[in-house]
A protein has these predicted regions:
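DNA-recognition alpha helix
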Residues: 40-55
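Basic, short loop/linker segments at the boundary and entry of helix-turn-helix/winged-helix-like folds
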Residues: 1-30
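A short, flexible helix-boundary coil/loop motif
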Residues: 50, 226-236, 320-406
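Short amphipathic alpha-helical "interface-anchor" segments enriched in bulky aromatics
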Residues: 43, 273-307, 312, 316, ...
Length: 406
């Protein structure tokens, strides 16, 4: 309720429908993700109807209805839902907003319909699928905004990144630095970030032969030990095609099986130490961990090959992730570091009796719960009561939730 769920749903731009409201449909899609039902068709297999009840239904809507609802969401409205949601989540304190990770993610399609192809990151083959690009708050690991597109030749680092970062900047005006992989190390893009958006960047360099020779040209005495490793580090000024002026090239030298090797990073950050910049670059792997954590939510389970349905479903999955992030933050302690799946197992996956009693919805847990589960849920509800967040829920007959453990 504190997120302003009605305003969020309005941002989808769906006209008022007879019967089932857009709000109820959105709630079902969000809750299905949170309980690990990766596809809308899995909703029909749920035997416990608490999910339906909390969305205001007597039973789960059919998969055909949910697909029809997704058909109503345009790509732009799905993205607008993400933007409005991210701004609401920012107020909840789940973003730090200074350093942003940006990365691409390939969602493979195994059906028979024709769809654009791209190289699969692990199978080393070209196959049909969807390109998704995600921005992530580096310090918290929470997603900010994502965009999907069909693979095509016109999809470049510049036309993907600039519009996305402009949106992220609108959500997080305090953004200072973006960290990404070597696909993004393109002069025209880095020029725009440096000169037009006043952003710092850190990117892994493409190891072309001329770059390797440039790294080898650094005198040995300029290398120093990289603390905490058996590697050496140095830096020099360098240039990049389509970038006006110079930038810093940070070089790491190491030996592997007796062979001298190098890798390097490009950055326009002359204020931070080279070690700090490498540390920030290493945290880019948080976005890889995010992709793994999202398997539970079904981020890669395409609802269709239609881009509008994919964008709509993606918006719901990102909302689900950040909703759980708010829950982790409110619970505190050991729960803050748990994955979405672990939160489900520790907090949500417990059978309970749900009954209405006057102006209350009484949720009663009968054994089989852990003491930590009981303490966490009671702490959470107490916080809701103290802050006024346990407000009457309109789609549940204007009733408040009450918890009991027996």
């Amino acid at each position: 309720m504190k997120l302003g769920i009605y305003q969020l749903v309005t941002s989808l731009g769906i006209k008022k429908q007879e019967g089932i409201s857009a709000l109820q449909s959105v709630l079902v899609l969000i809750f299905l993700a949170i309980i690990g039902k990766k596809r809308v068709s899995k909703g029909e297999t749920i035997k416990y109807y608490g999910i339906a009840a909390i969305a205001g239904f007597s039973k789960m809507p059919s998969k055909s209805y949910l697909h029809k609802f997704l058909d109503l969401i345009t790509v732009s409205c799905g993205e607008n839902f993400q933007i409005v949601s991210a701004k609401a989540f920012k107020k909840m304190g789940i973003f730090k907003g200074k350093i942003i990770n940006l990365d691409g993610h390939f969602i493979a399609y195994f059906g028979k319909s024709k769809i654009g192809k791209d190289k699969h990151p692990t199978r080393n083959i070209s196959m049909g699928g969807i390109k998704a690009f995600f921005s992530q708050d580096q310090e918290t690991g929470n997603p900010i905004f994502a965009r999907v597109a069909y693979p095509r030749k016109g999809l470049t680092p510049e036309n993907v990144t600039i519009p996305m970062l402009q949106i992220v900047k609108d959500i997080l005006p305090e953004m200072e630095k973006v960290v990404f992989d070597k696909w993004f190390s393109v002069g025209s893009l880095l020029e725009y970030l440096d000169k037009k958006m006043n952003l710092k960047y850190v990117t892994l360099i493409k190891l072309y032969e001329n770059r390797i020779e440039e790294m080898k040209s650094i005198p040995t005495e300029e290398f120093r030990p990289l603390i905490g490793s058996d590697r050496l580090i140095a830096f020099k000024d360098t240039t990049l095609r389509n970038f006006s002026g110079g930038m810093k090239l940070i070089v790491v030298r190491f030996f592997e099986d007796g062979i001298e090797k190098y890798y390097g990073y490009l950055t326009n950050d002359y204020e931070s130490s080279e070690e700090q910049i490498l540390d920030e670059k290493s945290w880019r792997w948080r976005i890889e961990n995010f992709f793994k954590n999202c398997d539970f939510l079904g981020m890669d389970a395409l609802p269709s090959i239609e881009l509008n349905k994919i964008a709509g479903m993606l918006a719901m999955k990102i909302f689900s992730f950040n909703l759980v992030a708010c829950l982790r933050k409110d619970l505190g302690g050991e729960f803050e570091k748990m994955t979405v799946e672990s939160i489900f197992e520790e907090i949500i996956e417990f059978p309970a009796l749900v009954k209405t009693n006057g102006d209350k919805i009484v949720v009663t847990f009968y054994g089989n719960y852990k003491d930590s589960h009981k303490a966490a849920v009671q702490k959470l509800l107490k916080k809701f009561d103290e802050t006024g967040m346990n407000a009457p829920i309109s789609w549940m007959g204007d009733r408040r939730i009450e918890l009991k453990f027996k």
